[in-house]
């Protein structure tokens, strides 16, 4: 069993924000496979289905970014899942827009959603970091992450989310390298970045 969590903020005013790319990615997975309708549980929206015969729960915490760990921690405990069966998808300031990196464990790099998950769950889980770029100065970070994706961003955003969703089964099978290769190749082949 797996839990795939996308980080973001609830509410229509945040829907297209850079900070909500985790929600967008989980929505892309939801649309790519057969999942149950979204329901409310664990202070989150949650859905379940199967990817490669593995039971998977998708979760979008509705606690706002800084408290994401509360919802994810509740779900992990309820389903008795280990951190090795948790995948978190979120925005990363220190990666160029559209770049993707994956790692197990590590620090939070100042990301408040990750800080919350680390505090409530521990640190040894899979992280898919999607680059949103840095605005250049610390004073502009808040405005940048809560700003909407630009028209230029839309050119890489949809294909990237589609590639993540279509290849997530590789990650569930434990093939991180092939997952990264497939996602990177999709972006490269489309000359998006």
Curated annotation (Swiss-Prot):
Gene3D superfamilies (alphabetical): Peptidyl-tRNA hydrolase (3.40.50.1470)
Active site per UniProt: 19 (proton acceptor)
Swiss-Prot/TrEMBL keywords: Cytoplasm, Hydrolase, RNA-binding, tRNA-binding
Residues marked Discriminates between blocked and unblocked aminoacyl-tRNA (site): 9
Primary site of residence: cytoplasm
GO MF, one annotated term: peptidyl-tRNA hydrolase activity
Pfam families referenced in this protein's UniProt entry, alphabetically: Pept_tRNA_hydro
EC main group: hydrolase
Reactions listed under catalytic activity: an N-acyl-L-alpha-aminoacyl-tRNA + H2O = an N-acyl-L-amino acid + a tRNA + H(+)
GO biological process: protein quality control for misfolded or incompletely synthesized proteins; rescue of stalled ribosome
A cellular component annotation (GO) from this entry: cytoplasm
SUPFAM superfamilies attached to this UniProt entry: Peptidyl-tRNA hydrolase-like
CDD domains registered for this protein in UniProt: PTH (cd00462)
Localization of this protein: Cytoplasm
Presence of keyword Cytoplasm: yes
UniProt binding sites for tRNA: 14, 64, 66, 112
Subunit structure: Monomer.
Protein purpose: Hydrolyzes ribosome-free peptidyl-tRNAs (with 1 or more amino acids incorporated), which drop off the ribosome during protein synthesis, or as a result of ribosome stalling. Catalyzes the release of premature peptidyl moieties from peptidyl-tRNA molecules trapped in stalled 50S ribosomal subunits, and thus maintains levels of free tRNAs and 50S ribosomes.
Alphabetical list of NCBIfam families matching this protein: pth
Family: Belongs to the PTH family.
Name this protein carries in UniProt: Peptidyl-tRNA hydrolase
Organism, as annotated: Bartonella tribocorum (strain CIP 105476 / IBS 506)
Gene: pth
